[in-house]
Design a protein with these regions (language model features):
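Class II aminoacyl-tRNA synthetase-like tRNA-binding/catalytic domains
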Residues: 2-118, 126-130
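A generic secondary-structure signal for well-formed alpha-helical elements
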Residues: 32-39, 148-159, 308
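Extended, charged alpha-beta segments that form solvent-exposed binding/catalytic grooves
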Residues: 103-189, 193
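A translation/RNA-centric and nucleic-acid-associated enzymatic feature enriched
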Residues: 108, 179-334
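Generic recognition of stable, solvent-exposed alpha-helical segments in well-folded globular domains
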Residues: 19, 23, 27, 136-143, ...
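Short connector loops at helix/strand junctions that flank enzyme active sites
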Residues: 73, 99, 122, 202, ...
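N-terminal pre-domains immediately preceding structured catalytic cores
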Residues: 41, 50-55, 166-179, 319
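A general structural signal for short secondary-structure junctions and capping/turn motifs
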Residues: 56, 66-69, 91-97, 117-119, ...
Length: 334
């Protein structure tokens, strides 16, 4: 199911689109690395299942897996994201306090439902930064979100300077709200509808504390219990005026420590994961305290370029019906 905006015409031809994609990605990557003190590193496309390093996302998505000839009997998985791998890399590389790493992450999410903003191909900047115990606060999380949002603003400014026909539309500041405050504000709406209404009102929002059970007995959304601390995480969401809908650009958070990992595994009935290598290191306090997240590259491009479909800024696979519908309505997929 996709949305076809009324009278949609992209302001960019296909080669202008490709050039603008490069401008956006280069500008954002450079700015992100500068404001968060990150160094680019190489990262894997796949990991061994037994390590527990793959990201379980919402806990139900199936990774693409295979066996390799020289390691028969060991299951290899295409990554969903690098949330856990990055934290291990910070330890291996000896990264200092308040310094971090980022990588170009490419993944396959086979169970994604295709629409204007979802693809089975995921490209994002995955980043992770070493923090102190005293940084494990909402205030530090919000400070980091503001730094990240400023990178969006600088990237938008660079795009507008290069392509005058492109108009700036992002608000100058981001609005913070917790998932509980959002539920209290709109108690009769579904979590997704709450996001829509609040994002449309504010333009740029960060919803914190996702994964925990709210006073209603429900969750705002599911989160895997073994990477984000559900009290210290959130989603950065911007309003997309072309699709007239909310668009999540980043999911991020302060990561679990020994206590929050144990608590969340218990709540999620996932204590069997304690035997995995990664979880053992965490429970023994052998990994640094960190904050990190993922930032959708194609989503940034489609939003800032005011594209109607993510396939206009990335090459992926779409259903025949979607391809035909897009072609009939002047939406040129790469």
């Amino acid at each position: 199911m996709i949305i076809i905006p009324k009278n949609y015409v992209s302001p960019y031809g296909i080669m202008d689109t490709e050039r603008a994609i490069k401008l956006i990605k280069d500008t954002f990557e450079t700015t992100l690395a500068c404001v968060l003190h990150l160094t680019r590193i190489s990262a894997p496309l796949f990991v061994k299942r037994a390590t527990g390093l793959n990201d379980d996302l919402n806990g139900v998505e199936r990774p693409v897996s295979f066996e390799m000839k020289d390691a028969e009997g060991q299951t290899i998985e295409i990554i969903h994201s690098l949330a856990k791998w990055k934290r291990l890399a910070l330890k291996r590389y000896g990264i200092s306090l308040h310094e971090g790493i980022y990588t170009d992450m490419n993944a396959i999410r086979r169970d994604e439902t295709l629409d204007n903003t979802h693809s089975i191909y995921v490209d994002q900047w995955d980043w992770e930064k070493v923090i102190a115990p005293t940084d494990r606060t909402l205030a530090y999380l919000q400070q980091t979100v503001n730094q990240l949002y400023n990178a969006f603003l600088e990237t938008e400014a660079a795009l507008v300077a290069h392509y005058p026909k492109c108009k700036a539309f992002l608000p100058k500041e981001i609005t913070f709200i917790s998932s509980q405050e959002l539920e209290d504000r709109y108690p009769t709406l579904s979590p997704q509808k709450r996001e829509e209404v609040f994002a449309k009102e504010k333009g740029a929002i960060f919803i914190s504390q996702i994964g925990k059970t709210l006073r209603s007995g429900k969750k705002h959304d599911n989160r895997s219990p073994d990477y984000d601390d559900w009290e210290l995480n959130g989603d950065l969401i911007l309003w997309n005026p072309v699709l007239d809908s909310a668009l999540e650009l980043s999911s991020m958070g302060i990561r679990v420590d020994e206590k929050s990992l144990a608590d969340q595994l218990q709540v999620a009935n996932a204590e069997h994961r304690k035997s995995l290598d990664y979880h053992q290191m965490l429970l023994k306090g052998e990994l640094p305290l960190t904050i990190g997240g993922g930032i959708g590259q194609s989503r940034i491009c489609m939003l800032l370029m005011q594209k109607a479909h993510i396939g206009e800024v990335q090459a992926s696979i779409w259903t025949d019906d979607m391809l035909q519908l897009c072609e009939e309505n002047g939406i040129q997929l790469l």
